[in-house]
Amino acid sequence: MRDVPALDLALENLRSGAPGWADLPLRAKIAMLEALPPRIVDVAPRMAAAATEAKGIASTSAWIAEEWTINIWVFVQAINTQILVLKRVLAGHEPVNADAVHTGPDGQVVVDVFPATGYDRLLLNGYKAQVWIEPGVSAEQTRAQAAALYRGTDPSDPEVCLVLGAGNLGTITALDIIDQLYIRGNVCAVKMNPVNEYLGPFYEHIFSEFISRGWLRLLYGGADVGGYLAHHPKVDTIHLTGSAATYDAVVWGTDDQAASRQANNRPLLDKPITAELGGVSPFIVVPGDWSAADLRFQAEHIATTKLINSGHNCNATQVLVLSQDWPLADKLIAEVRAVISNAEPRPPYYPGSEDKITSACRGMAGTEFLGGDHTRALITDVDAHSGASILTDEVFAGVLGVVRLPGKTVEQFLHNAVEFANDVLRGNLGAVITIDPKTRKQNAQA
């Protein structure tokens, strides 16, 4: 492995700079955040162009809009939201409005987090987002703990966090940086993923002030560099976005004793680690009385959750869950098939994608390759209890399975769908439930 002294020096500089970050007044931290969006805008065209070239997207393709949305707009949006909250704290207000924190009928606390501004309402009219707080935490505790880092009298000492960056979406790594600096109060070393390390120079420009003041370092290399940094004594904590295999390699090791360590819960890593590892995400369609326009619109919705970023998303839809008793199920599948078939082609760019597509489709009856190549596939009528790869292994590419579950009523179907998602599908990162307003109103207790 090259550049071990440089890696050691980077971590030493972060360790030395950490107290300065902790002592920086909130007003100054906000000012540093406010300087980021103009820097993002400054490099946005070149950053988007670099990403589209790396992903094999033609300069005339409509897919280019994706980069501007998920890798640039989301970046700026997250920063502006953070600024909004911190300015409220600076002014002596609670981080969120009191009426945004409320308790549901079952006693669980819910926080309304989007829209937060008039701009949000204008841009994404009709959309809303909530955070559901862990059961047992009261509304009063939720309000008291919000932005606790900036409202406590005795803040904890900052740690050096190693961020092992995501290779699929650059904005994940960028927001991990914001999370560590501003939400957790840590300084951080970011090991860029080799798949998208071309974004590193842009981030070095955007975060240049944080780097120059010793609060952030961007580092490059493969698994050997990541392993060295993870076990370095000057790294206190780790956050990883990647595969379960990468997590296992970091925590349990890769030698012939790794399986034994895992079986006996003797991790090789002796420090806290958090991770987002993806999984098999369901798209559950609650049966209802849908029009032809409804079917087409929701088919486009389903296809989008599968095809965005060529399917290289940790929370991409992998299994479409339908009621076997719904008369419109076949029509919805036909619409999904048509949308995916007619979508503009784009190559899978993530390493190993072709092998994962092959593995997911191998031996599966009803596999249809769509769009004229083998990069997109629909597997209809997957047996929910077959243990098929599409149900247990994250594909991270353009394969969509369809499972039909019994349920003559909405309540019966939802019970079966939730049980299937929780007990059969691997992981718990995300799920989508789509239900038409009339059916939802009629089955509010379901």
Labelled PLM ranges:
Residues 125-175, 184:
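Active-site-adjacent "gating/activation" loops or surface patches in catalytic cores
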Residues 160, 172-224:
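PLP-dependent aminotransferase-like
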Residues 204-211, 215, 225-227, 231-233, ...:
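ALDH superfamily catalytic-core signature
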Residues 1-145, 180, 192-194, 206, ...:
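N-terminal Rossmann-like NAD(P)+-binding subdomain of aldehyde/semialdehyde dehydrogenases
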Residues 33, 66-67, 192-196, 318-324, ...:
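Conserved short loop/turn motifs at secondary-structure junctions
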Residues 164, 189-193, 219-221, 232, ...:
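Generic beta-strand/beta-sheet core signal
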Residues 163-179, 192, 403, 411, ...:
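C-terminal substrate/ligand-recognition segments
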Residues 2, 17-35, 154-155, 162, ...:
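Conserved C-terminal structural/oligomerization subdomain of aldehyde/semialdehyde dehydrogenase
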